[in-house]
């Protein structure tokens, strides 16, 4: 299991994220931390961990979390890939439960879980941020065809920090995040994967996903960010048709029907 943690200036939270990996009941992992040229104390905090399973790379120039994540993927040697953001927290049994599922169900390309929302003080905030909580909590298992239709109509509802990806499946769809879709790179990757592989949603909240109101934070809303995300998701939807192979004619038909509604 290779775990990718991309960080930029998260000195307040990164230790909590790292500790949640170290405390996993599943122990056969490597944690690859890519620091994207942080200017706070992040690098000192990262270097304070002496666990031999932790690998680090410190970038000299800030790029983007997607670029940093791709660097981590290139370093990964595990059969599975998981990604944790530097401000999120995993429950102790997350990896054990998901790896067991993936071992027993080899047809699936990705296993996700549901999440609890936490605030800046690491307190549960499912009610406070009910919209984002319900987005992730109401997700249910679907066929590949149903997922494609859902993604095209509704956008992303899957939490990146909850995913365990089979590395062979990731390599089958290009192996990396697409840097042409920075800001919606998770959504675009899920699109590519779902066309090729079924995915599974575990009905347990195995992640504490941090949501902040502060301006400029990754998880915060702003009008400009809403517009940018909408435009990016529209681009991803359009690109999806290029990914569909000729043998998936039914998915093309469903996709065209959906595109006619949002184009």
Predicted regions and their residues:
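Short, well-formed alpha-helical segments that are part of the catalytic scaffolds
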Residues: 9-23
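A conserved acidic beta->alpha catalytic loop
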Residues: 20, 27, 35-44, 61, ...
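Conserved small/polar residues in nucleotide/adenosyl-binding loops
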Residues: 252-258
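Conserved nucleotide-sugar donor-binding catalytic segment
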Residues: 74, 113, 131-231
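Short aromatic/hydrophobic "clamp" motif used to bind/position activated sugar donors
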Residues: 81
């Amino acid at each position: 299991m290779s775990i990718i943690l991309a960080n930029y200036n998260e000195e307040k939270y990164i230790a909590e994220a790292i500790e949640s990996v170290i405390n996993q009941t599943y122990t056969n992992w490597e944690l690859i931390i890519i620091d994207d040229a942080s200017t706070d104390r992040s690098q000192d905090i990262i270097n304070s961990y002496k666990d031999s399973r932790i690998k680090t790379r410190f970038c000299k120039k800030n790029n983007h979390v997607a670029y940093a994540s791709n660097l981590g993927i290139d370093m990964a040697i595990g059969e599975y890939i998981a990604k944790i953001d530097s401000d999120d927290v995993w429950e102790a049994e997350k990896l054990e439960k998901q790896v067991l599922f993936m071992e027993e169900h080899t047809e699936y390309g990705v296993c996700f879980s549901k999440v609890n929302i936490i605030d800046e003080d690491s307190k549960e905030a499912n009610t406070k941020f009910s919209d984002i909580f319900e987005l992730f909590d109401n997700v249910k298992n679907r066929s590949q065809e149903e997922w494609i239709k859902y993604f095209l109509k509704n956008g992303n509802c899957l939490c990146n920090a909850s995913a365990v990806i089979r590395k062979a499946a990731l390599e089958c769809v290009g192996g990396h995040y697409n840097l042409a879709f920075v800001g919606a790179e998770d959504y675009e990757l899920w699109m590519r994967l779902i066309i090729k592989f079924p995915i599974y949603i575990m009905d347990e909240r195995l992640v504490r996903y941090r949501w902040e109101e502060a301006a400029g934070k990754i998880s915060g809303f702003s009008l400009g960010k809403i517009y940018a995300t909408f435009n990016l998701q529209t681009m991803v939807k359009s690109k999806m048709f290029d990914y569909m192979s000729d043998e998936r004619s039914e998915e093309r038909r469903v996709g065209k029907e959906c595109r006619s509604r949002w184009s």
